[in-house]
Amino acid sequence: QFSKGFAELGEIEFFERGVQYLGCNTRRIDDNVWVRVNELILPNFTQAGAAFAADGTKTRYFGRSSFTRWVVPVDDHHSVALAWANFGKRGDPIKYNTKEGCERIEGGETMDRTFEEKQKKPGDTEAVEGMGTISAHKGEHLMPTDQGVMIYRRRIRKLVKSLQEGKEPPQPQQKKGEIIKTNGQDTVLRVPKRNFDDRKFIKSIGSAVMKIQFDLENMPLKDRDDKIINKLSEMEKSGKF
């Protein structure tokens, strides 16, 4: 089950960095502002921040992804997923490296729940399977909040067409052979409300967090992460976003 923080309605922004697409959801959790970034690297690589330790209640600077997933279609109704769980100080602790933890990180729940339990407390599995084995686009009513879905579909169609034309698929590396820098993360800053529109305020904080990442993306990986963490801490202390 998701933490209570996930129930908070956030301010969403989308960013494109080559074949890397980022959905930034910024939520207020009491006196904290939680910036969570879901990442998609086309065509089929996804990751976000922590799965179990993420609730927006504790300060965190550039916490990293706790799961990394590749999903490959088999046919129009089935797909195969290859997923890695990543444990560490900046993600989920190693105590979740169990069979139950593996099931929960992938499906949002343990797999042996009864039908009644799934109906009372639905998880990721019910959200996905409830749509059926294939998405019927004609029956959809897309909203502004579905911008990420629309971007993804548009870019996938473009990539498929380019591949059919014999063009080399684009790669996420900045330089051939270098480690791919990713952006999926959780950042939690202590920023109490101020005397103006809090929705606009927290959105500006999310934008400021992303700008720090983008400004430093050409640095070597270790240097980049350390610099991002320092910049986030400095920004929180200064109160300037």
Locations of regions flagged by a protein language model:
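C-terminal catalytic domain of Rieske-type non-heme iron oxygenases
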Residues: 1-241
